[in-house]
């Protein structure tokens, strides 16, 4: 299970390939 662009990310739910977890807002953004 992974988060896509604009979705919440945290320790147990990483971002999908091609995305990164932006600090503080904890949302996935496109690389």
From Swiss-Prot:
Cellular compartment(s): Secreted
Tissue: Expressed by the venom gland.
A single MF term (Gene Ontology): toxin activity
GO cellular component: extracellular region
Superkingdom, natural source: Eukaryota
Disulfide bond listed as a keyword: yes
Primary subcellular site in the record, as a coarse category: secreted
Cystine pairs: 2-16, 9-21, 15-28
Record keywords, A-Z: Disulfide bond, Ion channel impairing toxin, Knottin, Secreted, Toxin
Domain notes: The presence of a 'disulfide through disulfide knot' structurally defines this protein as a knottin.
Family in the record: Belongs to the neurotoxin 10 (Hwtx-1) family.
Free-text function comment from the UniProt entry: Probable ion channel inhibitor.
The protein, known as: Jingzhaotoxin F7-15.33
């Amino acid at each position: 299970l992974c988060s896509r662009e604009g979705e919440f990310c945290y320790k147990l739910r990483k971002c999908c390939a091609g995305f990164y977890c932006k600090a503080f807002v904890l949302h996935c953004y496109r690389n």
